Amino acid sequence: MLDPNLLDILVCPVSKAPLIYDEKTAELKCKASGLAYPVRDGIPVMLEEQARAMSDEEALSL
C-alpha cells in the first residue's frame, strides 16, 4: 500500500500529470504520458527509463 499523502504530491516526471496507483501491478500509472512507474518495496521508482509504456487501451481505461 502506498501512503495516500505521498500519492497526493507525486506527479508524472514526464507530463506533470497526476498518477493513479494500481495495487494489482504495484505501479503508478499516468494517463497523460501512457507510462507506468514501478513501486518496489513501497518506494516509487520515478525514473522515465524504468517506466513501462502502457498500451493505448490500458491508458484509456484509467
From Swiss-Prot:
Pfam families: Trm112p (PF03966)
Gene Ontology CC: cytosol
SUPFAM superfamilies to which the protein is assigned, alphabetical: Trm112p-like (SSF158997)
Family: Belongs to the UPF0434 family.
Name of the protein described by the UniProt record: UPF0434 protein ABO_2103
